[in-house]
Amino acid sequence: MKNILLLILVCLGNMWTLKAQEHPVIYASASDKATILQKIADEEWAKEAFTKIRGNVEKYADRHTADPQWIISRLAMYWKEGERYTQCYLKNQNWDRGEGDAPVPTVRMPGMRTWNKYYNVPLEDRQPYNETGDMLGLNRQNPSAPPILVPYKESGHMVRGNNVEILTLAENAAFVYWVTGEEKFARFAADIFNTWLIGTYYMNPILDPEKSTGGTGGWEPGGICGYYDYEQIHDDLALHAATVYDFLYDYLKANPHVHLKEIGKETKEIAGVVFKRFIDIGFIRGGKSGNWNVNGWNMILRPILVLEENETYPDGKGKDYYLHYLTNESTIYHDAIPDMVKTYDPVTGLWPESPGYSFGTIQMLLDWAILLKRSGIDVIADNPILQKAAMAVFPWMDDAANMVVFGDSRGGSANFLTFENLLTYYTQTANKKGIESTASALNKGLSLGKYNRSNAGWTGICTYAPTIPVVKSETSERTSYSPHHRFITMKNWTGPFKMMAALYGGTDGYHLTANGLALQLYGYGYALAPDAAAYESYWSKDHVYHQSPVGANTILPGYSEGKIVIEAMEPMVESGKFVNEKALTPFLNFADISAGEKRRTVALVRTSDSDGYYIDIFRSDLNDNDYLFHNVGTNLEVVDVRGNILPFNQQDKFERMYHAGYEWFTNIRKTEYARNFIASWTMPENITARLWMTGEKGRQIYKVDAPATTLNKGLTPGNVSMPPSVTPTLIVRQEDNNAKAHPFVSVYEAYKGDTPHVKQVTAMSVRDCAGVKVLTGNKREDYVFSATDSQVYSLASRTFFSGTFGLISEVGGKIYSMYLGKGRLLQKGNYSLEAEQNVYATIYQVDGNWFYSATGPVKVKIGKMERILDEGYNKLLNIK
């Protein structure tokens, strides 16, 4: 009988062993190791990536061998005996006080919920065994300034950032150990992890007696407070610690922390307790929907994945329990994936918030998809909108593969990990079309130098497909429109000189901005006339400038947010689409948008493969208006049309301010000038931007220094207009002169070298029709028309126009092209486009051959030839 009982116990023990989760499990498993080693050996990018990872962490691992306290002492902890707090308290969303004294140092809580303008000095310069929590910091607005000691209660996210940095080193070391078996990396990572684990184990969730974060703190549901951050969506210490635990599982089991031996506990048990604290608090805090929900789940997914089966834990809540609520069933606190994906616009594939959140969320979801597929859950197959959401990045990407900036987004390179995750999935599922589309995106990033696979990190080594197939590049769209975001992109990338503009209305909410009817203009891979995005944080004083109409290229006062109406646009985005499917001509884009009392017509005019210019006709049905135009650069000069510098007088302040954001303008200079003028911005990389503006009565011109444009390197030529530099800004004030009848009309170009392409701009306006004649360097004369009614206007000799937008181009005195945007008539001499109903139509020459395009029936006259043509696109006209 004893032998039978012993056999039963042995069998039960073996069953338990079989049910226990094997490690690693999150990004790789033991069975993947050979494949990963082969990838490192065979693929140059993986070899370089691994070399970088090892090189970045090995110096610390070697130092740890000789001085094991060096890295540990730099963790932000409550080090001082008698003040090793076990319970901390919040007040006004910031750390207030602590009580209790643990037998070991406990992990320090952040000083504040909000950000500040400082970031930590290098690890080597940080104070070891810092008992006060005061942090040495460098100023983001002036990085060259000496570091200052930032008080603990004013330290923003510096404390958490410090610990995340050290845990990230431990992650890298743990991966290197798993690949190589070299114990120095394991010892380094284990000592960091164990110190963090035990120091967290003795800390209770923070209490918030005044309910400043919307809940009571502790274990009670509700509010936004996490376990180790005052916003659960930033509560990321366990995210990093979980991967250390995963790769080091066997080593940690064999080499437990000395304190665990003293209290008779195992690493696995304490890790489960600590990880479940982060998870359980995350389950009942944060936000139910939107980016808060996605970010909240992102904080706890990796800790969930390292948990054991449900029955391992006294509460019956293990890996499968929590995954059910991520993948299947929403709760009153958080939506599950099936409800998350309903947030995406089924037409555009876009998330409703600003670009940073829009593409940050899809990146997280696709990252989860790769991890969940390892657990047998295919969220991509079940939710095809995820693929559409990933591809929605292209219309919102410029030709340098940077994201558009509006709302509270900061900009920067597109996240190519999105496409790597999709390529991995498509490779696993043998989806040829998917492989081609994602490979095209990745190859573009590689060719532009915006993406380098050798920077993949250990997660990429684990999950990326070994190679990116070489495929044909996909043709870029010409126009995109998101009605929810009130955002239009216009692109003309048909030649080496690539043109792009963004035209958009304002939205209050969704991390978007009440920015007015705004415009951004691009050149040479940069947003040269951008939207301001260098604010410190949501809570900083400069937010009122950067996240307002004052930080945008618009007109004040008046419309700042609300519905926009597309009066005309071509290439047109049809209803139910995100991008255009057809285009009338390779040489022109335009859009005419109204919003409130404002109406703005913007056109991209390509004059050759290497040149082009932008038209901006901005109407405002107010008598007093300020036209704001920000352009990055080192200098702004304003001259008359003969090149004479206009005299400006220094001003202490504006006589009138239309928004509190005006307070952020400095170095105010003013001149009164009612004639045509030229504003020029000088930039690094030998780039100059020029804006010609036609004159109107009641004009005052201001040159001001606006705050920096961006905090991100690589978004401006030579990183100009980054802190502590300024953004040279033009303000054209028009008083007692209604700008609907007398609009702001400008022509903008960017060029390299000393020779501008636009030589002369002449106004030609009559009543509700505004126009200019543009003379360019290749003996080309363009006649531009913009009207707000259906009357027939004649602005120049032998010309007639009835429509929303028109362009007649002559080269050497001979008509080269004609373009009619939503109109009935465009004529010069014996060349004309005429229709009974409003149409979009054009005739143009390529290599001496005439082509036509039209959205409906149109009578075309070219010299003696006259024909009635039906709808068609880029069709050859056989004219002898």
Describe the residue ranges of each PLM region.
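Catalytic and substrate-binding regions of extracellular carbohydrate-active enzymes
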Residues: 448-659, 738-740, 746-754, 762-766
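Non-catalytic terminal regions with compositionally biased, polar/charged low complexity
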Residues: 731-742, 749-880
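Structural helix-adjacent loops and short alpha-helical linkers that scaffold large soluble proteins
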Residues: 24-51, 57, 61-67, 88-108, ...
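Beta-strand-rich recognition/accessory modules
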Residues: 682-778
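C-terminal, helix-dominated tail/subdomain
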Residues: 378-454
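Polysaccharide-binding surfaces and accessory modules of carbohydrate-active proteins
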Residues: 631-698
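Aromatic-lined, polymer-binding surfaces characteristic
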Residues: 159-390, 410
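Bacterial Sec-dependent N-terminal signal peptides
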Residues: 1-21
